């Protein structure tokens, strides 16, 4: 704490009173005779010049003490106060920097998290789109295969039917021609029918 003028005046007053009171107390240790006012003044101030010299000496000593002790001490205290204030300021600055760094880290973390979620959502959307496209292509390919198979089966059935009809006409023509050449018995007729049926079955195979 820095001393002001009031503190200095109080210290000087205490020292002055001590110079005055100490001789008085010393003189009062013995038997105290009855003193008149003049003797009391002479006892308190036996010699005015000695008192003045003591006051001057006290002021000189106090000035030396103030010069040799107080100023270096005050200077050291000022440096200490400046050092403490600097440490407090540095601590506050470090705290603010740490808070700012924490805020930046939080912002970067949130941004990275949002970007990650966006990438995941985009990947899911692209995967769903690709799956739907592949399913559509697969359905179209399957429909084409089924349609082609149906057409092929229908063509093959038509060709077989046409071939069977042609063979049946040919067989009927041959049978009619054979019947015209000779008269068949019941047994020969059954044989011709059985032979015609077997030929149809063989042709179907």
From Swiss-Prot:
It is found in: Cell membrane. InterPro entries: ATP_synth_b/b'su_bac/chlpt (IPR002146), ATP_synth_F0_bsu_bac (IPR005864), ATP_synthase_B_chain (IPR050059). One of its GO terms (molecular function) is proton-transporting ATPase activity, rotational mechanism. It comes from the Bacteria. It is a single-pass membrane protein. GO terms for cellular component: plasma membrane; proton-transporting ATP synthase complex. A lipid is attached at residue 28 (S-diacylglycerol cysteine). A lipid is attached at residue 28 (N-palmitoyl cysteine). The keyword NAD does not apply. Residues 1-27 form the signal peptide. The chain crosses the membrane at residues 48-68. It holds the Pfam family ATP-synt_B. Keywords: ATP synthesis, Cell membrane, CF(0), Hydrogen ion transport, Ion transport, Lipoprotein, Membrane, Palmitate, Signal, Transmembrane, Transmembrane helix, Transport. F-type ATPases have 2 components, F(1) - the catalytic core - and F(0) - the membrane proton channel. F(1) has five subunits: alpha(3), beta(3), gamma(1), delta(1), epsilon(1). F(0) has three main subunits: a(1), b(2) and c(10-14). The alpha and beta chains form an alternating ring which encloses part of the gamma chain. F(1) is attached to F(0) by a central stalk formed by the gamma and epsilon chains, while a peripheral stalk is formed by the delta and b chains. Belongs to the ATPase B chain family. F(1)F(0) ATP synthase produces ATP from ADP in the presence of a proton or sodium gradient. F-type ATPases consist of two structural domains, F(1) containing the extramembraneous catalytic core and F(0) containing the membrane proton channel, linked together by a central stalk and a peripheral stalk. During catalysis, ATP synthesis in the catalytic domain of F(1) is coupled via a rotary mechanism of the central stalk subunits to proton translocation. Component of the F(0) channel, it forms part of the peripheral stalk, linking F(1) to F(0). This is ATP synthase subunit b. It comes from Ureaplasma parvum serovar 3 (strain ATCC 700970). The gene is atpF.
């Amino acid at each position: 704490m820095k001393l002001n003028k009031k503190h200095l005046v109080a210290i000087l007053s205490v020292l002055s009173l001590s110079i005055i009171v100490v001789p008085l107390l010393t003189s009062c240790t013995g038997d105290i005779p009855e003193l008149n006012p003049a003797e009391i003044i002479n006892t308190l101030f036996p010699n005015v010049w000695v008192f003045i010299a003591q006051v001057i000496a006290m002021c000189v000593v106090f000035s030396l003490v103030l010069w040799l002790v107080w100023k270096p001490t005050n200077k050291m205290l000022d440096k200490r106060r400046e050092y403490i204030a600097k440490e407090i300021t540095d601590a506050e600055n470090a705290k603010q920097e740490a808070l700012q760094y924490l805020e930046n880290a939080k912002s970067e973390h949130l941004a990275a998290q949002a970007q990650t979620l966006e990438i995941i959502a985009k990947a899911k959307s692209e995967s769903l789109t690709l799956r739907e496209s592949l399913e559509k292509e697969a359905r179209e390919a399957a429909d084409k295969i089924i349609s082609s198979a149906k057409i092929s089966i229908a063509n093959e059935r038509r060709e077989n039917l046409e071939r069977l009809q042609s063979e049946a006409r040919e067989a009927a023509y041959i049978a009619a021609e054979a019947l015209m050449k000779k008269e068949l018995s019941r047994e020969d007729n059954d044989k011709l029918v059985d032979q015609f049926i077997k030929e149809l079955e063989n042709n179907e195979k």
